[in-house]
Design a protein with these regions (language model features):
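Regulatory loop-to-helix N-cap segments in sensory/regulatory domains
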Residues: 115-133, 140-141
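Signal-transducing coupling segments at domain and membrane junctions
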Residues: 74-95
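Short coil/loop residues immediately preceding or within conserved phosphate-binding loops
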Residues: 17, 96, 108
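Amphipathic alpha-helical coiled-coil segments that mediate homodimerization
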Residues: 1-22, 133
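Soluble sensory domains of the PAS superfamily and closely related sensory modules
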Residues: 60-69, 76-79
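GAF sensory/regulatory domain recognition
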Residues: 9, 21-51, 56
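A short, aliphatic-rich beta-strand micro-motif
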Residues: 94-102
Length: 141
C-alpha cells in the first residue's frame, strides 16, 4: 500500500534515522513479519529476516501490552542475550522507538524507528512523530 510506504518514508526523512519498519500480525509461522519499510542509504532490509523469534523479545512483550518503547541506547536496555543477538542481526541496532498499532485493544501492527551504529537521544518531537505515524498506519490498515 503506497500510502503506508509514504507514512514510513516521511518518518524516516523527518528523523534522519536509519530504518523504519512496519510489522503486521499476519497468519503464518513467523510472528509479526516486516511488511513495509523505509531505509536510509546503505541500510539492509529486514523484510526477509526470519531468525529472530519476536515472541520472546522483551520489546515485543511491551508491544503486546500496548506500550511504546523508547530506547536512546539499546545496548543498555536489557541484559537478555537474545535481545543483543537481535540487535546485531538487525545491523547494529543502537537506538529505537517502537510503537504499537492498536485495534480494539489488541496490537495488530508495530511501527519501529531504528538508529544503527551509535546511540542517540530521541526528542519529544521524534517520539510524537512515531506515535502519529502509528496512528495513521492504523487508519490505513
Amino acid at each position: 500500500m503506497a500510502e503506508i510506504d509514504d507514512v514510513l518514508q516521511a518518518l524516516l526523512s523527518s528523523t534522519g534515522a536509519s530504518r523504519v519498519t512496519l510489522r503486521q500480525d499476519l497468519p503464518g509461522d513467523y510472528a509479526f513479519p516486516v511488511t513495509h519499510e523505509a531505509l536510509a542509504a546503505g541500510v539492509r532490509s529486514l523484510k526477509e529476516e526470519r531468525t529472530v523469534d519476536l515472541r520472546t523479545q522483551p520489546v515485543a512483550l511491551e508491544m503486546a501490552a500496548g506500550r511504546q518503547v523508547v530506547q536512546d541506547d539499546s545496548a543498555r536496555a536489557y541484559d537478555d542475550p537474545a535481545f543483543h543477538r537481535m540487535r546485531e542481526t538487525y545491523g547494529g541496532l543502537a537506538a529505537q522507538i517502537v510503537t504499537p498499532v492498536l485495534a480494539d485493544g489488541r496490537t495488530v501492527a508495530i511501527v519501529s524507528l531504528h538508529q544503527l551504529g551509535s546511540p542517540r537521544r530521541w526528542t519529544e518531537d521524534e517520539i510524537e512523530a512515531c506515535t502519529a505515524a502509528a496512528a495513521r498506519v492504523g487508519q490505513l490498515l
